[in-house]
Amino acid sequence: MKDYRFSIPGELKVRGYCRDLTEYVTKKQLTDEGLWKLFVNQYKIHSDKNGEWKGEFWGKTMRGACLTYISDKNERLYKVLVSTIEDMLSAQEKSGRISTYAEDIEFNGWDMWCRKYVMLGMLYFLSICKSKKLKRRVINSLKKQADYIIERIGDGENKKSICDTSKLYGAMNSCSILEAFVKLYGITKERRYLDFSAYIVNGGFSKNLNLIEESLSKRKYPYQFGDVKAYEMMSCFEGLTEYYKYVKDDKYLRAAENFVDMIVESDYTIIGCCGCSTEMLDNSSVTQTNYSDDIMQETCVTVTFMKLCSKLYLLTGSPKYMDYIERSAYNAMYGAVNDTEQTMKRTDGDVWVEDGCYQVEHEPYPFDSYSPLVYNRRGKKVGGFMVMQDGRSYGCCACIGSAGVAVANLATISAYNGGFSVNLYNSFTFKTEYNGLAVKLECNADVY
């Protein structure tokens, strides 16, 4: 069996258009120290008081930043990430909690989802961290966060079911914390984290339907699952691929592969995204041909689908997953990058209140949230829009986009125990060592 991997820091250097996008995102967002401080502050003041999701911003951006560092090895970026990790560690309560929800309203709404992103942000940082001492502190923080959750969520007496920690989408958002727990088990090898992962998997990711069993049976397409929020559903299957690595039960890999196969058959559009009804799966392989001025093709979905495909590629080596990443990257993903410095003054930033919503002015973001499939204007609305302090605001897609750019970079070339595979037509230089010999691969390409 071939053991596939992507680049480690320093091996790969992309050039041309891909590098332009990487440098733009790094300068515009990932080295903005004020933005990082603002994200961490949401945990210190518990700013999500009414079921919001500002707690996802830090971890989503951190994951993308770490993947960007792996693909580009920008040392200024690394220093900024060390600084924000230190800041986040200072936000941890004595109990182990790191949450934007106050304790008296915890484990509701998006709380588990946001905790997932804190853990994932730290876990991805561990993959680039150069300090053994800092690594130990981060792992200790992760264990405290996870143990706090395990003590309160589960099947035991006086515990809350994970499917009761959110009333949204069958609690798929909460169940997607699986990936974080499996990764933590992979680092610590402490059994309780794998046991908690098994508890999540055994529940099937939703209060309303066992998504794993449905994917194994292929009786329904994902848009027929009932809870059809694409991003959260895909995030659960990302966790399942990680779970498979340790339990080695082929049915879990098969479920994830079937899920992607069914998505591609029923909900994969010409630009490589899914869902033509806002952020929902809706048989968009077909519905993409219907004219619509509504928002659709969410950037969060594009990136998450790319990440899921990259995980399945590393497990299987199947080139079809690279075909999917290629379509998504060169169309929906790159098209969503605001590298032309649009002001976004006409992009709606909606703040919802009891009797409706109102719009607020906001800064331009590095990524658009949605992509039209007809001749139309981009940037109609900010996805997951949240107002914070200091006159600043942000959104979910603005945070996740950097991961999509980085995944496209890393997918360019892979190594395995038998050689190398050039997967995407990008300009790059790749240097590594193979069987004691120095290897250099170079490609000069024009993406478009």
Residue ranges and their predicted role:
Residues 1-448:
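Glycan-recognition and catalytic cores of secretory/periplasmic carbohydrate-active enzymes
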